Every structure is written in C-alpha cells, then in structure tokens.
Amino acid sequence: MKLAKIAVLAIALGSGSPSAFTTATRTAAVTIDYPEDGSIFPPEITPPTFLWRDSSASATSWRIDISFADGSAPIHALSKGERLRIGSIDPDCVADTNKPPALTPEEAAGHAWKPDPAMWAAIKKHSVNAAATVTISSGPRSRGSVRIRTSRDPVGAPIFYRDVPLMPSELERGVIKPLAESAVPLVAWRLRNLAEPRSHVVMRNLPVCANCHSFSADGKTMGMDLDGLENNRGLYFLANVKPEMSIANRDLIQWSTAKGVLKGSARIGFMSQVSPDGRFVVTTIDPLQAAGKSDSSNYYVANFKDYRFLQVFYPTRGILSWYSKAAGVLQPLPGADDPRFVQMGAVWSPDGKYLVFARAEAKDANPPGRPMAQFANDPNELPVKYDLYRIPFRDGKGGDPEPIEGASQDGMSNSFPRISPDGRWIVFVKARNGLLMRPDSQLYIVPATGGKARRMRSNTRLMNSWHSFSPNGRWLVFSSKARSPYTQMYLTHIDENGNDSPAILIENSTAANRAVNLPEFVNIPPDGLRSIGGPALEYFRWVNRAVYLQKHNRLAESIAMWRRALDLKPDDALAQRNLGMDLLMTGHRAEAGAHLQRAAELKLSAAVADHPEDAQTHEALGRMLLEHGKPDQALPNLHKAAELDPQSAAAHCDLGAALLALGRLDESLAELRKALALDARFAPAYYNLGLVLSRQGEADEAVRQWRKAIEINPQYKEVHDSLGSAFYARGNAAEALSHWRQGTSSPAALRQMAWLLATWPDQSLRNGQEAIALAVRASQLSDRNDPAVWDTLAAAYAEAGRFADAVLAAKRALALAERQNRPDLVTAIQSRIRLYEGNKPFRVSWNSGASRADRAPR
C-alpha cells in the first residue's frame, strides 16, 4: 500500500488547561495519547487523528505499523509527525470575555498523523473480528502501541447538535442569561453525518435562544424549547421533520396558553421531551402556586465571566406536566407534581409506558443573605442534589414515583437520565451539586430497574454530559471539555452488557473557538434534515431587527420591520404594541391608536384563554372590544361574564351596552333594567339606559336617566357629553356648553363646542378664538382627516375675522367630504365657502326643524 499522506492537524485543544493526554504505554519512549488503548470506532466514521509524544528530542520521522489479528497483511506508513495546530477560528466569536484556544507546552510537544481515507478503510475492514495494533516508532527502542477495533454496529444516524460561542454576559443575579445579547444570533444548529468529514448548518441567526431539543423514536417529530421575546421562556415548537423544515405559527406552543388546568402557570418550559411515538411532550414548568412569581424564585442561576464554565443553572422548584399534541392540552402528571419537590428533566422509556426524572427537595433559589457564586462549584452555590425516580405514565394518570437504586440517595447529584432504546440501561450524570455542565460531572450507567451504578470508562477528565443513545442503542454521544474549554463532542460504544469503550473525538464539529452541546442522534437518513426555517422563525428575526432599529431611534425603518413581523404573525401583541408606539412617535396618531388598541385586545384575549371561568376577565375584554367599536366581538365575552356572575350589575350593564351598539334595543333595555335591579345606584346603567331611550325617541326620559347618573357621579364625563347634545338639540346652547365643558374632551365634543362658539346666533355665547383652539385640538386628535372638524375650524376662523384662513380650511373640508362620499356635507360646505369668500361668517338658523347640517357638522 502507498504511504499515507501526511495530514495537517486542525483540531481545537485546550487553553492553559491541564493535559488531556492519557498514559498509554508509559514505559515506552513513544506515548500514544489518542486513540486510547481499547478504543472502538464505528464502521462509517472518517479517519481519526493519531496523537503521540516522543521522549527522544532528536526524532524527526516516525514509522507507523498497523498489524491485524485476522492474518491480513500489515499496513506501514511514514510520518514527519506534524506539530499540533489549533483549528480554524470564527472571528465573530472572538471577544474580550473569552480567550482563543491555545496549546499547553505538553500539547505543543506532541505529534499528529491521520491516515488517508483508503488506508483508514483498510484498517477498519481488518479490525472488526479482532483488534488492530497500531505501533508508532522513531527507532528500535522508541516505540508505543495501542489496540483499536472497528465495531460491527453502525451508528446508523446523524447527530443534531447546538454550536455556540462562549461569550459570557454580565453577571446578573437570578437572570438566565449565559450569553451576551449580541452573541445569541451567532448560535447555530448543525447535523453531522459521521461518514462525512464535516457537519452542515441547518439553522442559524435566531435572535432568541433555542435550546433543549428532542425527537420521536422514528425521527419524524421534533420539539424544541425556545426563549421567546421579552424574557418569555415558555415557548416551544413541535413540528414534523422534513429535509426542509418550515416552522409555522401553528407549530408554536405557548405553555401558559395551552388548554388544560395549568393555564397561566407555565412561565418556563424546561428540558421538554417528545414521547417515542411523537404524541406527547413532557416538560418541567413552575409549580401551580408559584404562578406569577419571578423566574428567579424557581431557578438557581449564576452567570460568570469565566468563559470556560460561564453559567450555573438548575431548577429549585418545578413540576412535570405533559402535553397532548392531538388535544392541545397541558396537564400536571400526578405523582410528579408535588410542590414539596422540584421534579424535572424527565425522559420517556422506549415504549412510552414510564418516565425517569430527577427530583430534589424544593427550596428558594435565592435565600436572603446567601452570597452569589463566583465560579462553577463555588461553595457558595445553593446546594441541590437530585435523585433519579421512575414513574408510570399511564396515559397521563401518573402514579407513585420510585427512586432508582444506584442513582439516588447516594450523597451526590444525579441528573440528565437517558434510557437505552432496548430499555435495559440508564446513563446519567453524577456530580457533587446541581446538574449538567459541572466540572466534575461524570457519566454513570445503571440497570433501568435499578442496581449498582458503574462509572463509564469513556469519561474524560473534565465535564461529561449532554449524552444521547444512537437508535440501535450501541453508541452514546456526549460532550466534554477534556481537550478544550470550547466543548467538544465524543462517542463511545456500549455492548449488550453495558460495557463502554474509551471516548472517540468527533473531529471538525465546529470552529476551534466555538462549543458543541446538546448532541442528539436523530433516526433519519444522512440528508433527512437540511434546513430549519419558516415564518415562525423569520418572525423572531424581523422583531429582533425592529428592536435594534427602535433602540437607535431609526423609527421609519423599525416601523417597516414591525410590519413585516405582523405579516407573519398578525395576532402578536408585542409587534402590535411596538408598531403602535413607533407610529405614535412619528405622528401617525390614528394608525397608532388602532395598533395599540389591538395589542391591548390581544393581551386580554390571552388572559381570557388562561382564565376561561373568570367573569371579570371576560368582562374586561368585552368592555375593551366595545370601546374599540367591536360590539359583535364583545358580545360573546359579555354574555359569558353575565352568565358566570349573574349578580354583577356591571356585567349586565356592559352586556346591555353591547346590545345597544348592535341596535338590539329591547334586549339592551332588559339587561340594563337587570343591572339597576341589582344596584339602583349604578351610574353607567342610567347612562346606557338614557342612550337606549334616546334611540327610541324618548328624549325627555333619556335626559331624566342621565340626570340620575350625574346625581350619583357628578364627574361622569360621557353623561355630560350626552346632556350637552340633548340640550343643544333643544336650543339651550348655554346649558349644552356647560355640560360639554365638563365632558370628555373627545374630538366630537371639542368639535361641537367649537361649532357652537363659532356659529350660535347669540353673540354673548360666541368666542372665535376659543372656537379656533378647540377645533385645532379636535383636528389633532382626529389625525386631521375629519371633514366635519375642518368645516368647524373654517367657521371658527370666519367668526374671528380670518376669512382667508376660513376659505382654505373649508376647501380642505370639502375635499375630504368629497373623498369620503358625504354629499349632504359637501352641499353645506359649498354654501359656507361662498359666505367666507364674501367675508361673512356662518350662523346657524336654529329651530327644531333645522337641518342637521345647519346645526352642527357631523
């Protein structure tokens, strides 16, 4: 066979960390550090990089001999022993808060060689039945050997994982924020086929953190926890896996609005897991009695400036809940919903019949007086030691949790269980405190029914966690910081007896200054997942851009971004509110008001969904919709409020107001009389009753009802507006003006006052300057698009002797009236323009039969 080509090593190694090298063949002058003796490789993996050190300083070349126990001819190669080099660096991930990876002196003294693909294929072929021996020598007495083997068991599936920068955020007690805000869009998600030398990106540039992910056993369903906007950590997507996945809004779940008894309590969804059949999701949420509390009361969080271990994070309160994909219902799991404990990190058995989860005594995450931890495993960390428990699922009925022998009550913290696909084994993380990313975390394996737990051979010297079984159960992928503070991905083989092999590095998983975490095997073909995108994820990108532009006062651009976000998600309160605020700041008052109103409606609609049996919430939403001119939408909520609380005068009054707005006067009258029967001093009922009577032509009786309302509440502005209009209709201008001055100062009320002050026949009541001021204010409030307001302003200018201004204002009113197809107003304005052009003001000719256009423009 031809000599192997010499490969230049491009692999991330530690920065100032102790050597990760092993002690294989210590008596020899050549020490082979990787792979370790006894390593097992999957049949499809690409060539590994062999690493060794030679005590002979004069050695300049090495002979590599691979011999086989199956009788095949040995393979020989020569290597110049290239020095180790750091892999490629992502410049976007270089920051003041981290350091580039660097070699220790020991690592810098090492050498590297990688067999070419043809040679590696031959090595794998002849090392299946028995181990191959790899000997590296620089002379007759300088040699070292390791035995390696190729498994018959393929990995059989690609690995989905998260690829993150290590750019710590500022320390903020109790806030879950491991990365600086600017670093979050740098997070990527990759898929790695071990038969290929590199991975490919399937999702990137999300402005929110997407983290714990899981797949159904057949690889057809994917779920992922999302940190939504405004620190919303209760978002989740559940979607069908396709080569090009498009996440739609229908695929998003907000735990706090999912149907079921847990409404409003699910502030955070944590370590959610899709069931093997894809029908259910189990997640950890806040305990019911903690609903509305801050996140910091349920999670111990410490963020550090040390990029190597930049966060300590674990729940101190929580219950397990399960979600039905078919029903859209979120329910607590009986037996794992005890508020005395924190119950979290549940995983499914392969048949979906039971769950294994971590449990500890519940406690306050931030007790008063406790110092904040400054580093991982700081003695000041809140002590929490989890035990593993098993509980039946029984279609959501749960049962009695039972501790798992070997993974509980051992003085250590046992967490992150993963059950083998054959149901025989549980691999979990054991550490002194907390869970997951601990410097001392080690992988242990225990029978699924409980028993003696064994420390796995594949453990590296520093942090072992985030593990996942291959679909055939013969391989385990996990993450470690053994070679670098920038976490890397490793592989170990597990046989039928639960014995595992030394760790195999999955090389070239990302740049040398980025970290790999949350690796998970996915039961799909190598090209079964090429991209994840879609409108739901694009929405986050537009919103993130809009927020950036908003912060930098680039409001015209941010408005465009908010509009794009709303194109993707029209019923989003956040985007509606922010668009409304930006429009308001740029002077578009009317459009701003519409968006702000919609945002408020959406917020209350969410509250109704959370509390469907709460009469006050239904009433609040119904009243808001009614105020926004949507009585048809308000009616169902107001009916429900009156049904839930039949003794509420307010509920019957609001229902009566909605029926009035819909023209159902008799029904409205009945509801208002019910309200007054319940509370004879309920002023709003008298107000609405007056409106009904006025619509029925009983003007005098309407005034009597409004006077009763004023007797109860002299400051009732809407009643003053109605009384003003009633007295104006009677020709009592002084009384009308008195009430309007005490009214709402709405555009309509301001316009009517201005019209009276500008046009009334009695000179003692006219005041041109005040009329101008009131009309200008009405125009501002109506976004300058109401022809009646411009008509009123023209009359006010004429009363003040400003006839040229009167003509201009009247012509603006005429143009608007023509555009809005208001022929009666057009005719009236045309006649008034002729007066102003002749330097004459307009005077109403008031009598009971005068046309409405002569009394006051509408």
Regions found by a protein language model. Give the residues of each.
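Position-specific recognition of the canonical hydrophobic site in helix A of tetratricopeptide repeat
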Residues: 550, 584, 619, 626, ...
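Structural marker of alpha-solenoid helical repeat scaffolds
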Residues: 568, 602, 610, 644, ...
